[in-house]
């Protein structure tokens, strides 16, 4: 029998959650992570599935995700513990044929359930599937320290925030030319914040929740982690810059345009125009 804990997707989730914990982005039960799978990914592991998978209805139907499996982090679970007990802290779920709910096929033992941010994740998956023609498969939410800090001192405006991050590190425009979406502060774990996040995910692969954290999307766990890591590194540089009295020189608009041309990306126009 194949052991699902040795599968590429469980091992990938272990690495991503452990790395995020070591970065200091996911204290206690902070943060959540979901990866969209294919039936072929889980086909070898049916013997590992629960004999009677629990069924949980969704608060709103997700027709686009019908019959789709995911691996998800659990509600109230600590990222630091995923590596110690994957089955207790992760779960493989599969949305039913009409998108009304999902079965927990593996993991989430002792009656655990998926992350409370599952509505935000599933809604964002729907939008990123449409925006990227199915390329994006990962949604990651974490409490990246310096990005959160900047939401207290920068104008919480997409163009302003994006331009500052682009100027904070040269690679940022190349990694996220589509910029960073920003929400107003909202109560987490609700359909409302999920819908607002998904709306921004139509246009941006990164979405900030002021005074809370960040959502990122990408085609793989590595790409999504790297996206957030790149933005967070720039935020760290900016925090140091502001603590030293602010910028005396920076990357100019003309230089940002040249950077975009060199790497074949189209920078967010509103951020470039500032």
Curated annotation (Swiss-Prot):
One of its GO terms (cellular component) is cytosol. Binds 1 zinc ion per subunit. Keywords: Cytoplasm, Lyase, Metal-binding, Rhamnose metabolism, Zinc. Zn(2+) binds at residues 141, 143, 212. Gene3D superfamilies: Class II aldolase/adducin N-terminal domain. The active site is at residue 117. Transmembrane segments: none annotated. It comes from the Bacteria. Its main location: cytoplasm. Its cofactor is Zn(2+). One of its GO terms (biological process) is rhamnose catabolic process. InterPro entries: Aldolase_class_II_sugar_metab, Aldolase_II/adducin_N, Aldolase_II/adducin_N_sf, Rhamnulose-1-P_Aldolase. Pathway: Carbohydrate degradation; L-rhamnose degradation; glycerone phosphate from L-rhamnose: step 3/3. It catalyses: L-rhamnulose 1-phosphate = (S)-lactaldehyde + dihydroxyacetone phosphate. The keyword Nucleus does not apply. GO terms for molecular function: metal ion binding; rhamnulose-1-phosphate aldolase activity. It is found in: Cytoplasm. Its EC number is 4.1.2.19. Homotetramer. Catalyzes the reversible cleavage of L-rhamnulose-1-phosphate to dihydroxyacetone phosphate (DHAP) and L-lactaldehyde. NCBIfam families: PRK03634.1, rhamnu_1P_ald. Belongs to the aldolase class II family. RhaD subfamily. HAMAP family: RhaD. This is Rhamnulose-1-phosphate aldolase. It comes from Shigella dysenteriae serotype 1 (strain Sd197).
